[in-house]
Amino acid sequence: MENKTIARTLRLLSQLMELHDENPFKVRSVANAAFKVDKLPYPIASKTLDEIEQIDGLGKSIAGKISELVQSNTLAELKDLLSQTPPGIVEMMRIKGLGPKKILIIWKDLGIENVGELYYACNENRLIEAKGFGLKTQEEIKKTIEFNMASNGRFLYAQVESFAEALLDRIKTEIKPEYVWLTGQYRRKSEIIDSIDLVLVKELDHTILPKLESWDYKDIEVLENQIKFQSEQGIIVQLNFVNNNESGWELILKTGNQEHVDILQSMLKGADLYAKTESEIYKLAGIPFIEPELREGDMEFKLAKSNSLPQLIQYSDLRGSLHNHSTWSDGIHTLEEMALFCKNELKLEYLGICDHSKSAFYANGLNETRLAAQQLEIDEFNKKHSPFRIFKGIESDILYDGSLDYSDKVLSSFDFIVASVHSVLNMNEDKATARLIKAIENPYTTILGHPTGRLLLSRNGYPIDHKKVIDACAANQVIIEINANPLRLDLDWRWHQYAISKGVLLSINPDAHRKEGFNDMRYGTLIARKGGLSKENCLNAMNLEQISVLFEQKKKKQQL
């Protein structure tokens, strides 16, 4: 066993000992030993126990640990500490700037147990509320996590958007193709992006490579009619050069996905595609133009053949924003600041405020006394700013048994309720499904929040039987949230059509914790389009009068 492996193991042991509040002297002794072993000019594994004990700065106790590690390839003490520590907490120890003391606060005070949750908390500005954390530390942690994500070669759509659009503009300005389009996963608005692909109507000539080299991209590779390179952030880019007469089919081909292309090709039956546009090619196949977001294979062709392709929702269709937080719980801006931003900047008609409920102690959840005070503030605001309206909501935790964490009397005081799971996420499918369905069957539940609890590229959601959950929402007239945070985008777009077919409304909710968070509704709209959502099936595309009636009807049923 190499010295570096032994040192790394001792370092982890010292970190876990400190995390679990063991004797500071022993912690320091193990940490010092890790440093010492790493600097030794000879392999310590070749030494006897007695020889290790004689090494300056180690001693009998440390020598015993090293001997045990070399002989058994493990440490009983380390295994015991690891069994008491969530794997995600151990993973956090690799993040620069996070020592055991800070990790302990993150774990015990904020209730965060993995890197995905930590990244989400950074986006919500939750870390700056904790002891020993400031804005600078939070940003450094966020950047480190983003760097680690990038090293895996996969990105959230929101992470690559500004780069992709800037690259498109630069190509138009400096390479000057006749036409250029972003294609691939980006054009299909996929939630995860592996590469940025473009189609350029231009010959790949000797003038292009020097320009790309001057842009400081890495690993530039010239192929036949294609140039590949990597951005500074690690994003793979592919430029595909075509002539104008082939551009329609090439645009379809490079947009994909492959299943969509294969089905379309079989429908074309060898038709002449020369000088045809995208729309003309779909017409040759006997179907209407299919929007790029829908091109994932099978579902879109069934809709096209039955002339049932939806008029996809647009961001401008949204009339209000539901599921948002303020300084009453873990938000950054006050209730008034959030509402005025919606009213004056976004020109929306209403805001749904849904601060965390009392079980969410880690997020400054509201007890009954604070709830009453918040509702008084909402009443005062609504009097001053009519016709704009704040709806009184709450993000009520779905407890482990599926119940909500307030009495019926308190629940009846809200205009609407978003019910979400935030704790005990380690469930099998049966348990998770039953837990959600019990909450859905609660007459006070209006919207089911982020149904699987997933954090893209960071944390898998708990497994659920989507059909059973959606069917329960249909039976109980519960709306399902499309959580618009780019890390969530949950309900997954693959289930939107099933929900729509069952008559379930979907709601594009930003889960905003500060004013800038409302911008996430745009990402929610993109993923809703991918799922085939039209404004008629979207709750917050309703105007103020329509949604007020819906909430009132729900409240009347609660009283039956």
What are these regions, as identified by a protein language model?
Residues S14, K26-I196, L200-I227, I236, ...:
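Accessory alpha-helical DNA-binding modules that contact the DNA backbone or grooves
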Residues G393-S396, Y523:
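Active-site catalytic microenvironments in core metabolic enzymes, especially phosphate/sugar-handling
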Residues V180-L182, G320-N324, E395:
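Two-metal-ion RNase H-like nuclease active-site motif
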Residues V180, L351-I353, L448, I480:
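Hydrophobic residues within beta-strands of alpha/beta enzymes
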Residues M1-E22:
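Charged, compositionally biased N-terminal leader segments and the immediate start
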Residues E113, E178, L348-E349, T446:
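Short acidic/polar active-site loop segments enriched in Thr and Asp
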Residues K189-S326, L335-L346, K358-F388, Y400-L560:
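Charged catalytic cores and adjacent phosphate/nucleic-acid-binding surfaces used
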